[in-house]
Protein backbone atom coordinates (compact mmCIF):
# COMPACT_ATOMS: atom_id res chain seq x y z
CA UNK A 1 0.00 0.00 0.00
CA UNK A 2 1.25 3.47 -0.91
CA UNK A 3 0.65 6.33 1.42
CA UNK A 4 -0.01 8.83 -1.35
CA UNK A 5 -2.15 6.67 -3.61
CA UNK A 6 -3.87 4.64 -0.93
CA UNK A 7 -4.05 1.58 -3.09
CA UNK A 8 -5.56 -1.32 -1.26
CA UNK A 9 -6.43 -4.56 -2.91
CA UNK A 10 -5.59 -2.97 -6.25
CA UNK A 11 -8.30 -0.30 -5.94
CA UNK A 12 -8.04 3.46 -5.67
CA UNK A 13 -9.89 5.13 -2.86
CA UNK A 14 -10.28 8.88 -2.96
CA UNK A 15 -9.55 10.90 0.10
CA UNK A 16 -13.01 12.16 1.05
CA UNK A 17 -11.75 14.06 3.98
CA UNK A 18 -9.71 16.28 1.72
CA UNK A 19 -12.84 17.47 -0.09
CA UNK A 20 -13.60 17.60 -3.80
CA UNK A 21 -13.39 20.60 -6.12
CA UNK A 22 -16.64 21.53 -7.98
CA UNK A 23 -16.46 21.34 -11.73
CA UNK A 24 -18.96 24.25 -12.21
CA UNK A 25 -17.18 26.77 -10.10
CA UNK A 26 -17.60 30.24 -11.81
CA UNK A 27 -14.67 32.54 -11.97
CA UNK A 28 -14.83 35.82 -10.11
CA UNK A 29 -14.99 37.89 -13.31
CA UNK A 30 -17.97 35.97 -14.60
CA UNK A 31 -19.69 36.25 -11.23
CA UNK A 32 -19.34 40.04 -11.44
CA UNK A 33 -20.85 40.08 -14.94
CA UNK A 34 -23.80 37.96 -13.75
CA UNK A 35 -24.54 40.40 -10.94
CA UNK A 36 -24.50 43.29 -13.40
CA UNK A 37 -26.91 41.47 -15.73
CA UNK A 38 -29.27 40.70 -12.85
CA UNK A 39 -29.34 44.38 -11.92
CA UNK A 40 -30.09 45.32 -15.54
CA UNK A 41 -32.92 42.78 -15.75
CA UNK A 42 -34.42 44.08 -12.51
CA UNK A 43 -34.26 47.67 -13.78
CA UNK A 44 -35.87 46.65 -17.11
CA UNK A 45 -38.70 44.88 -15.27
CA UNK A 46 -39.22 47.94 -13.09
CA UNK A 47 -39.42 50.17 -16.17
CA UNK A 48 -41.91 47.78 -17.76
CA UNK A 49 -44.09 47.85 -14.64
CA UNK A 50 -43.97 51.65 -14.61
CA UNK A 51 -44.96 51.80 -18.30
CA UNK A 52 -47.88 49.42 -17.70
CA UNK A 53 -49.00 51.55 -14.78
CA UNK A 54 -48.87 54.72 -16.90
CA UNK A 55 -50.83 52.98 -19.64
CA UNK A 56 -53.52 51.91 -17.18
CA UNK A 57 -53.74 55.47 -15.84
CA UNK A 58 -54.08 56.83 -19.39
CA UNK A 59 -56.85 54.32 -20.17
CA UNK A 60 -58.68 55.28 -16.98
CA UNK A 61 -58.36 58.98 -17.85
CA UNK A 62 -59.70 58.28 -21.36
CA UNK A 63 -62.70 56.43 -19.96
CA UNK A 64 -63.39 59.29 -17.57
CA UNK A 65 -63.18 61.80 -20.44
CA UNK A 66 -65.60 59.71 -22.53
CA UNK A 67 -68.02 59.54 -19.62
CA UNK A 68 -67.83 63.33 -19.22
CA UNK A 69 -68.43 63.76 -22.96
CA UNK A 70 -71.50 61.49 -22.87
CA UNK A 71 -72.86 63.42 -19.91
CA UNK A 72 -72.30 66.71 -21.75
CA UNK A 73 -74.09 65.35 -24.84
CA UNK A 74 -77.00 64.23 -22.70
CA UNK A 75 -77.25 67.66 -21.11
CA UNK A 76 -77.12 69.27 -24.57
CA UNK A 77 -79.94 67.05 -25.85
CA UNK A 78 -81.97 67.88 -22.77
CA UNK A 79 -81.40 71.60 -23.31
CA UNK A 80 -82.42 71.30 -26.98
CA UNK A 81 -85.62 69.49 -26.05
CA UNK A 82 -86.43 72.15 -23.46
CA UNK A 83 -85.78 74.84 -26.07
CA UNK A 84 -88.10 73.14 -28.57
CA UNK A 85 -90.81 72.81 -25.92
CA UNK A 86 -90.42 76.49 -25.06
CA UNK A 87 -90.71 77.45 -28.73
CA UNK A 88 -93.89 75.37 -29.11
CA UNK A 89 -95.38 76.93 -25.97
CA UNK A 90 -94.51 80.40 -27.27
CA UNK A 91 -96.19 79.69 -30.60
CA UNK A 92 -99.29 78.38 -28.84
CA UNK A 93 -99.43 81.48 -26.65
CA UNK A 94 -99.05 83.75 -29.69
CA UNK A 95 -101.85 81.92 -31.50
CA UNK A 96 -104.10 82.31 -28.46
CA UNK A 97 -103.30 86.02 -28.30
CA UNK A 98 -104.10 86.42 -32.00
CA UNK A 99 -107.44 84.68 -31.53
CA UNK A 100 -108.30 86.90 -28.59
CA UNK A 101 -107.20 90.04 -30.41
CA UNK A 102 -109.32 89.16 -33.45
CA UNK A 103 -112.32 88.50 -31.22
CA UNK A 104 -111.88 91.81 -29.40
CA UNK A 105 -111.48 93.71 -32.67
CA UNK A 106 -114.64 92.11 -34.02
CA UNK A 107 -116.60 92.98 -30.86
CA UNK A 108 -115.34 96.57 -30.84
CA UNK A 109 -116.15 97.07 -34.52
CA UNK A 110 -119.66 95.71 -33.96
CA UNK A 111 -120.12 98.06 -31.00
CA UNK A 112 -118.99 101.07 -33.03
CA UNK A 113 -121.21 100.31 -36.00
CA UNK A 114 -124.26 99.42 -33.93
CA UNK A 115 -123.88 102.37 -31.56
CA UNK A 116 -124.44 100.13 -28.55
CA UNK A 117 -122.18 98.89 -25.77
CA UNK A 118 -123.91 95.54 -25.30
CA UNK A 119 -121.28 93.83 -27.46
CA UNK A 120 -118.59 94.93 -25.05
CA UNK A 121 -120.47 93.85 -21.94
CA UNK A 122 -121.52 90.52 -23.36
CA UNK A 123 -118.17 90.07 -25.23
CA UNK A 124 -118.25 86.79 -27.10
CA UNK A 125 -121.98 86.12 -26.45
CA UNK A 126 -123.51 87.85 -29.45
CA UNK A 127 -127.30 87.34 -29.74
CA UNK A 128 -127.54 87.71 -33.53
CA UNK A 129 -124.09 88.00 -35.05
CA UNK A 130 -124.31 89.80 -38.34
CA UNK A 131 -121.47 89.60 -40.88
CA UNK A 132 -119.25 92.61 -41.23
CA UNK A 133 -118.53 92.41 -44.94
CA UNK A 134 -121.68 91.64 -46.90
CA UNK A 135 -122.62 91.72 -50.55
CA UNK A 136 -125.94 93.37 -51.57
CA UNK A 137 -128.54 91.38 -53.52
CA UNK A 138 -127.58 93.17 -56.76
CA UNK A 139 -123.99 91.98 -56.45
CA UNK A 140 -125.16 88.53 -55.41
CA UNK A 141 -127.13 88.23 -58.65
CA UNK A 142 -124.03 88.99 -60.70
CA UNK A 143 -121.79 86.59 -58.75
CA UNK A 144 -122.78 83.31 -60.53
CA UNK A 145 -121.36 84.50 -63.87
CA UNK A 146 -118.10 85.47 -62.21
CA UNK A 147 -118.03 82.10 -60.41
CA UNK A 148 -118.38 80.31 -63.74
CA UNK A 149 -115.37 82.16 -65.09
CA UNK A 150 -113.38 81.33 -61.99
CA UNK A 151 -114.37 77.68 -62.21
CA UNK A 152 -113.30 77.50 -65.87
CA UNK A 153 -109.97 79.04 -65.04
CA UNK A 154 -109.60 76.70 -62.07
CA UNK A 155 -110.10 73.66 -64.32
CA UNK A 156 -107.25 74.84 -66.52
CA UNK A 157 -104.94 75.43 -63.55
CA UNK A 158 -105.97 72.26 -61.72
CA UNK A 159 -107.27 74.20 -58.72
CA UNK A 160 -111.01 73.45 -58.92
CA UNK A 161 -110.88 71.15 -55.92
CA UNK A 162 -113.82 72.35 -53.87
CA UNK A 163 -116.90 71.29 -55.82
CA UNK A 164 -119.25 70.29 -52.96
CA UNK A 165 -120.60 66.75 -52.92
CA UNK A 166 -124.11 66.23 -51.62
CA UNK A 167 -124.23 63.89 -48.64
CA UNK A 168 -126.84 62.95 -46.04
CA UNK A 169 -127.13 65.49 -43.26
CA UNK A 170 -125.43 68.31 -45.23
CA UNK A 171 -126.80 71.01 -47.48
CA UNK A 172 -126.16 70.86 -51.18
CA UNK A 173 -124.75 73.69 -53.28
CA UNK A 174 -128.22 74.90 -54.24
CA UNK A 175 -129.09 75.30 -50.56
CA UNK A 176 -125.90 77.24 -49.96
CA UNK A 177 -126.49 79.56 -52.92
CA UNK A 178 -130.10 80.21 -51.91
CA UNK A 179 -128.99 82.91 -49.44
CA UNK A 180 -129.74 86.44 -50.56
CA UNK A 181 -126.60 87.84 -48.89
CA UNK A 182 -123.14 86.23 -49.03
CA UNK A 183 -120.67 86.79 -46.21
CA UNK A 184 -117.06 87.48 -47.16
CA UNK A 185 -114.13 86.88 -44.85
CA UNK A 186 -112.61 90.00 -43.27
CA UNK A 187 -109.14 89.50 -41.80
CA UNK A 188 -109.45 92.61 -39.62
CA UNK A 189 -112.55 91.45 -37.76
CA UNK A 190 -112.84 87.68 -38.21
CA UNK A 191 -110.42 85.10 -36.78
CA UNK A 192 -108.56 82.67 -39.01
CA UNK A 193 -110.44 79.35 -39.49
CA UNK A 194 -109.05 76.23 -37.84
CA UNK A 195 -109.16 72.45 -38.14
CA UNK A 196 -109.47 69.95 -35.27
CA UNK A 197 -108.90 66.69 -37.14
CA UNK A 198 -105.96 65.83 -34.84
CA UNK A 199 -107.88 66.64 -31.66
CA UNK A 200 -106.18 70.04 -31.31
CA UNK A 201 -107.21 73.29 -32.98
CA UNK A 202 -104.68 74.20 -35.70
CA UNK A 203 -104.81 77.39 -37.79
CA UNK A 204 -105.33 76.84 -41.52
CA UNK A 205 -103.08 78.08 -44.32
CA UNK A 206 -104.18 80.64 -46.90
CA UNK A 207 -104.68 79.05 -50.31
CA UNK A 208 -105.61 80.55 -53.66
CA UNK A 209 -107.90 83.58 -53.83
CA UNK A 210 -109.52 83.72 -50.41
CA UNK A 211 -109.36 79.96 -49.90
CA UNK A 212 -107.96 77.89 -47.06
CA UNK A 213 -105.91 74.72 -46.69
CA UNK A 214 -105.71 72.52 -43.60
CA UNK A 215 -102.37 72.49 -41.80
CA UNK A 216 -102.77 68.92 -40.58
CA UNK A 217 -105.41 67.04 -42.62
CA UNK A 218 -104.58 65.02 -45.75
CA UNK A 219 -106.79 62.87 -47.97
CA UNK A 220 -105.87 59.68 -46.10
CA UNK A 221 -104.56 60.60 -42.66
CA UNK A 222 -104.13 63.43 -40.18
CA UNK A 223 -100.75 64.60 -38.93
CA UNK A 224 -99.23 67.85 -37.72
CA UNK A 225 -97.68 69.60 -39.47
CA UNK A 226 -97.97 68.62 -43.12
CA UNK A 227 -94.51 67.36 -44.16
CA UNK A 228 -92.59 69.51 -46.61
CA UNK A 229 -91.72 68.30 -50.10
CA UNK A 230 -87.99 67.49 -50.31
CA UNK A 231 -87.74 68.48 -53.98
CA UNK A 232 -89.64 71.80 -53.85
CA UNK A 233 -88.99 74.71 -51.53
CA UNK A 234 -91.78 76.22 -49.40
CA UNK A 235 -94.17 73.41 -50.44
CA UNK A 236 -95.93 70.67 -48.52
CA UNK A 237 -97.74 67.48 -49.44
CA UNK A 238 -101.31 67.62 -50.69
CA UNK A 239 -103.89 68.42 -48.03
CA UNK A 240 -107.57 69.32 -47.69
CA UNK A 241 -108.50 72.65 -49.27
CA UNK A 242 -111.48 74.99 -49.72
CA UNK A 243 -111.81 77.76 -52.30
CA UNK A 244 -112.74 81.31 -51.42
CA UNK A 245 -116.23 81.09 -52.96
CA UNK A 246 -117.06 77.90 -51.05
CA UNK A 247 -115.77 79.47 -47.84
CA UNK A 248 -118.01 82.52 -48.39
CA UNK A 249 -121.04 80.26 -48.88
CA UNK A 250 -120.08 78.35 -45.74
CA UNK A 251 -119.90 81.59 -43.73
CA UNK A 252 -123.30 82.61 -45.09
CA UNK A 253 -124.80 79.28 -44.13
CA UNK A 254 -123.31 79.38 -40.61
CA UNK A 255 -124.49 82.98 -40.12
CA UNK A 256 -128.00 81.95 -41.19
CA UNK A 257 -127.93 79.12 -38.64
CA UNK A 258 -126.97 81.53 -35.85
CA UNK A 259 -123.30 80.62 -35.60
CA UNK A 260 -121.12 83.24 -33.91
CA UNK A 261 -118.59 84.43 -36.48
CA UNK A 262 -116.55 86.08 -33.73
CA UNK A 263 -115.11 82.65 -32.90
CA UNK A 264 -112.91 80.65 -35.32
CA UNK A 265 -114.78 78.37 -37.71
CA UNK A 266 -113.84 74.68 -37.50
CA UNK A 267 -113.49 73.37 -41.08
CA UNK A 268 -112.99 69.75 -40.02
CA UNK A 269 -116.30 68.56 -41.51
CA UNK A 270 -116.39 70.89 -44.52
CA UNK A 271 -113.28 69.99 -46.55
CA UNK A 272 -113.55 68.72 -50.12
CA UNK A 273 -113.73 64.93 -50.34
CA UNK A 274 -111.85 64.46 -53.60
CA UNK A 275 -108.20 64.71 -54.65
CA UNK A 276 -105.96 67.70 -54.09
CA UNK A 277 -103.01 69.36 -55.78
CA UNK A 278 -99.73 67.55 -55.45
CA UNK A 279 -97.77 70.69 -54.57
CA UNK A 280 -99.13 73.43 -52.33
CA UNK A 281 -97.25 76.67 -51.74
CA UNK A 282 -97.67 77.96 -48.20
CA UNK A 283 -98.51 81.68 -48.30
Swiss-Prot record:
Question: Which keywords, in A-to-Z order, does the entry hold?
Answer: Coiled coil, DNA-binding, Nucleus, Transcription, Transcription regulation
Which parts of this chain are annotated as the region Alanine-zipper? 51-86
Query: What start-end ranges are recorded for coiled-coil regions in this protein?
Result: 63-89
Recorded GO terms, molecular function? Answer: DNA binding
Q: Subunit structure, briefly?
A: Homodimer. Heterodimer.
Q: Which family does it belong to?
A: Belongs to the BBR/BPC family.
Q: What is the name of the protein in this document?
A: Protein BASIC PENTACYSTEINE5
| Source species | Arabidopsis thaliana (Mouse-ear cress)
Q: What lineage does UniProt assign to this protein's organism?
A: Eukaryota, Viridiplantae, Streptophyta, Embryophyta, Tracheophyta
